[in-house]
Each structure stands twice: as C-alpha cells, then as structure tokens.
Amino acid sequence: MPALRTRVAVAVAVATLMAAPTGVASAVPTTAAAPTDGWQQKSFTYAMHKPWNLDLSERYRYDSGTKTHTMWVYSTDEPLEEGSSTDPRTEMRWNQEYTSGKHMWDADVYIPSGTNGADFMQILRVKHPSGTPATDIMLRVSSESDGTVKRYTDQVIKSGVYNKWWNLKVAHDADAGKIQVYADDRLVLTVADRGSATRHFKNGVYHHGSGRAEARFRNIHYWVK
C-alpha cells in the first residue's frame, strides 16, 4: 500500500504541474526593443572642417586600430573660413543631406575633462527658410557635474560624461518634425525640430568656450527608416 500511495502522490504532482496556468510564463521579463530596431544601416561619407590656416593633421587624428576619430581645437584657433566671425571648429560634415524621412546618427562618444562650451553633435539646417534657425539641435558639453551634455544650454542629456565612453543616438523624423535623443540606448529627450529644411549631421568640436576642446568618436553608424 505505501508504494501505491507514493505512485498516486507523484501522479497528482505531475498533473498539478501540467495544469498550472499558462499565464505564469508572462512573469518572465522581456527584452526591451533597441532604438535601432526596424531601422536599416546605410553607408555615409563626410568632409572634414578645420581652422582654415592649419593642416588637418594638426587638429584631427584617426586610429585605424581602434577606429577612433579624435578632433580637437583651441579657442584661439582661426574659424573654418578666413574672415568669418564663427567660432573655431574641427568637425566631420556628413555629405548625406535630407529633407524628409527618418534618419539616425549613432556613435560612441568620449569627451576628455576640460572640454567646456563645445558643441560635439548637431543637425545643421544647411538650406532653410529665411528667418528660421540654422540648426535643429546642438549637443553641448560643459564642465558642470564632471561633464554635462545639454541640448543647447537647457535640457540635460547626460551628466558625468568626462573620460569615459558612452553611446549617443540622435533620431530625426523629418516628416513628423520630431527629434529623439538616446543616451546609452535610453530615451532622454523628445523635441520638435525647427520646421522644413535640408539637413545633414555634423560631429566633432565647435568651440564656444576657452582653452582646448576635444571629442572622440568610434562605432559611427548611419541609420534610415
């Protein structure tokens, strides 16, 4: 009899497990969608902008081993064009221009401490209606809180960025007039663009502060949707 009771107990236990509600499976956490899900990666080309009177090698370096682009500039440097009143810069000017569709800039970014008052990524409105802004968004780093990135000088994107690699994605839906910014794949900002225009991406250092400004970029990608 004890053996029979054991067999019955086992059978009941198995039946109970088989009858367990399937809803229990929903407790298993699901992986959140990545910002690039549904997007298609495209190749891109670019031209380099730098102080007009200097050789590119004096303000730009590419490490083929780590595939890292390093750009720097000093507040005392000359502008892009001789006689211009704009601030000094060393930047990658993307050649891919667009007026519609969805476009995303994606890269790992490293900003050394001491870089203060430099824009390191922007969407430039290269052709825009008279009286409208020249950019849809500019991301600037300041020295506060060990390196703080803001949209222009207001909304905070990320703090504590000095001397470390982190990922930045800027997605622009030109048809809907919407820009979304992701820091380490977390959506941190959604804002409207500034109306119809022909645009392109830029990254590097466009320096409005004092001293030296530097930014490094690797794993740079261009996505469309």
Give residue spans per PLM region:
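Secretory targeting and sorting signals
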Residues: 1-29
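Extracellular glycan-recognition surfaces and repeat-rich motifs
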Residues: 45-71
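Short strand-turn-strand beta-turns centered on an Asx-Gly dipeptide
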Residues: 182-186
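Ligand-recognition surfaces built from glycine- and aromatic
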Residues: 33-41, 98-106, 116-118, 160, ...
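Short tryptophan-centered beta-strand motifs in secreted/extracellular beta-sheet-rich domains
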Residues: 107, 164-173, 179-181
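Secretory/extracellular carbohydrate-interaction modules
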Residues: 61-144
